[in-house]
């Protein structure tokens, strides 16, 4: 990713950075509109997720997470920006004339060929079942349910590692540090998701954040007591508690929020590290 730094000609361009190489020119038959209503509200209009709202209108790109065009070679034609995710996407022209979007693998360039199937080479961008991959393979876009499509390791720079295969299951180490079991018949894509340096890009001003649909975040210590448990006091007062809490009074640090009786509890060998 080529980072272009703005010239400091105005305060709004100071410290700003954008990617100068990736543009957005989607195909009409692979996009459709979205009805964004609420922006963090429920059906009653009450805020259920804070710090969301506004933002520029978006068109959703249909991404092929299933990679079910088996044994048909495709060629990367474009690498495009997708406003619905922080990873880039690339347009694939398959040999049978079909065109699809997939997540852009790191290092893939225009003109590269990819393929999905059971007996395909272990090459960046190829999709195949876990049972056909050697141990230590770096993968992304991993299926949890066979045939449902990739659900794990899809963010920019995400990569998981195949560390073991035993019986009907394969053991994966996910980007979060979690180690879990997945069926060996599930498929994944070889390589790492592109746009690794997305966290190095500086938006430069508050308005750029608003375009993404993210509203300002206010600290609880500067609120009134009616709005937050940390609020109140004269001047720059401390929070008045031994440990910080959420706006609803729950512990803010270290509290586990995962359901204890979730179906995948027995499949997780080691919980994610912070």
UniProtKB/Swiss-Prot annotation:
Residue ranges of the region described as Disordered: 1-22, 225-274
GO molecular function annotation: rRNA binding; structural constituent of ribosome; transferase activity
Entry GO CC: chloroplast; mitochondrial large ribosomal subunit
Gene3D superfamilies attached to this UniProt entry: 2.30.30.30, Nucleic acid-binding proteins (2.40.50.140), Ribosomal protein L2, domain 3 (4.10.950.10)
Major localization listed first in the record, in broad terms: plastid
Keywords: Chloroplast, Plastid, Ribonucleoprotein, Ribosomal protein
Subcellular location: Plastid, Chloroplast
HAMAP family reported for this sequence: Ribosomal_uL2_B
Family: Belongs to the universal ribosomal protein uL2 family.
Protein name from the UniProt record: Large ribosomal subunit protein uL2cz/uL2cy
Originating species: Arabis hirsuta
Lineage of the organism: Eukaryota, Viridiplantae, Streptophyta, Embryophyta, Tracheophyta
């Amino acid at each position: 990713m080529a980072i272009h730094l703005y010239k400091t000609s105005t305060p709004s361009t100071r410290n700003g950075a954008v990617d100068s190489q990736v543009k957005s020119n989607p195909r009409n038959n692979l996009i459709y509109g979205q009805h964004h209503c609420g922006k963090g509200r429920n059906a009653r209009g009450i805020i259920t997720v804070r710090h969301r709202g506004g933002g520029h209108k978006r068109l959703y790109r249909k991404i092929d997470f299933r990679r079910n065009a088996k044994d048909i070679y495709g060629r990367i034609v474009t690498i495009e920006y997708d406003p619905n995710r922080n990873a880039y996407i690339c347009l694939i022209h398959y040999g049978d004339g079909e065109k699809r979007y997939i997540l852009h693998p790191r290092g893939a360039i225009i003109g590269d060929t990819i393929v999905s199937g059971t007996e395909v080479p272990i090459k960046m961008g190829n999709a195949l079942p876990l049972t056909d991959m050697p141990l230590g393979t770096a993968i992304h876009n991993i299926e949890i349910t066979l045939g449902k499509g990739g659900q794990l390791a899809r963010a920019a720079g995400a990569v998981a590692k195949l560390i073991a295969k035993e019986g009907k299951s394969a053991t994966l180490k996910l980007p979060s540090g979690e180690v879990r079991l997945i069926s060996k018949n599930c498929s994944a894509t070889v390589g790492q998701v592109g746009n690794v340096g997305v966290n190095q890009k500086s938006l430069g001003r508050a308005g750029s954040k608003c375009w993404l649909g993210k509203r300002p975040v206010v600290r609880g210590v500067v609120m009134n007591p009616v709005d937050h448990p940390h609020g109140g006091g004269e001047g720059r007062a401390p929070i008045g508690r031994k440990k910080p809490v959420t706006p609803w009074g729950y512990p803010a640090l270290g509290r586990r929020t995962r359901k204890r009786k979730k179906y995948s509890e027995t499949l997780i060998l080691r919980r994610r590290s912070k």
